[in-house]
Every structure is written in C-alpha cells, then in structure tokens.
Amino acid sequence: MSDATYIEIKSLYKVFGGQPKSILPRIEAGESKQKILDETGHTVGLKDINLTIKRSEIFVIMGLSGSGKSTLVRHFNRLIEPTQGQILVEGEDVLQLNKAHLQEFRRQKMSMVFQHFGLMPHHTVLENVAFGLKTQGVAKGERNRKASKWLADVGLDGYEQQYPAQLSGGQQQRVGLARALCTDADI
C-alpha cells in the first residue's frame, strides 16, 4: 500500500463561544487561553494544528485531559466545525462537502469509538454493532453475520442478545470497538 498522504490538517483552529472568528487575532498575537477566556468568555479548543497522516500509518494523538484530543478527532468528519483551517482526506476538502456527501463520507470512510461508547441502551449488543452497516443499507442477514464475527473477535461471542446495561464497562467498550470495526471503514 502506498505511503501517500491520506489525511492532512492545515492551520486548524477551534474557538468555542459566540463570536469565535473575532478571537483569532488575539490567539495569533500570542494571548493565553486563560486571558482570552477571562476577557471574552471564549474557549480556545485548538490552536494552529498542522499534521499529515500517511495511508496505512498508525497515528496516535495523545495529551493530557482537556488538551483537545477528542475535539481534534471530531473535526476529521465534521462532528465539530472548525473556526478556521483545512481538513483534507485523500486530497478532498471535507469542509466543502455538502450534507449528502458528508453523510456518505461518515458512513463509508470513517468509524469512531467514542469515549463514553455511545451505545443505544434499547438495542441488543448485536444491533449496536450492526448499526453502522444498517445505515449503509446492508441486508440484515449480512450485517448480523459481520457483527457476530466482530463480537467474537473482541471476545464477546455469546453476548449478542444482551443489552448494554447488562455488560461491564470494559465489555461496553469492546462493543463500541466492534461497531467501529464492523463497517470496514478506511479511517
């Protein structure tokens, strides 16, 4: 597989608050996050993030609690819209995708494991894992087969008809992982 650039983030900023673009000059002038928060009520989430991820590269984003890891990753598929910057996946500007193309991008290109798992409590473990395939329009038999395979791969064979509340936190996390892997998304 080629080592060509797959994801590129250029000059990404995220400011939370009522007028985020008005804060950019203060950030660029070097004012601290705390001063900006104290004086404007705006929170600087991301400041001038630039990164390149190659195809087939394992890329780790790590940092202290509250440092912006989840905020950054949620920008990749526009679960959070940036204040400024560019997000390219295979050279395509994700910020330029219309609603229909963005929905297709999210269904086909990217899967996420959320910090709090995001499991649907009134659906079985099998239904939770198969959910992404359902949104892709995969037939029920095929999605259940794939979901069962991934449940077995994460050590939860036999738990298909259980509900999330019946599982430990670690088991719930594995359900979230199986759901993300089940769609065979590129990212």
Mark where each language-model region is:
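Helix-to-loop junction immediately C-terminal to a conserved catalytic motif
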Residues: N77
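Hydrophobic anchor residue at the start of the ABC signature
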Residues: L177
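Conserved ABC ATPase "signature" region
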Residues: P25-K35, E90-D93, A130, K134, ...
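Conserved ABC ATPase signature
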Residues: Y163-L167, Q171
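ABC ATPase NBD coupling module
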Residues: I36-G41, L95-M110, T135, K140-N144
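Signature (C-motif/LSGGQ) region and adjacent switch/coupling loops
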Residues: N98, R106, L126, A152, ...
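A short, proline-enriched helix->beta-strand linker immediately N-terminal to the Walker B motif
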Residues: C182-D186
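Short coil-to-helix segment of the ABC ATPase nucleotide-binding domain corresponding to the Q-loop/switch region
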Residues: H123-F131
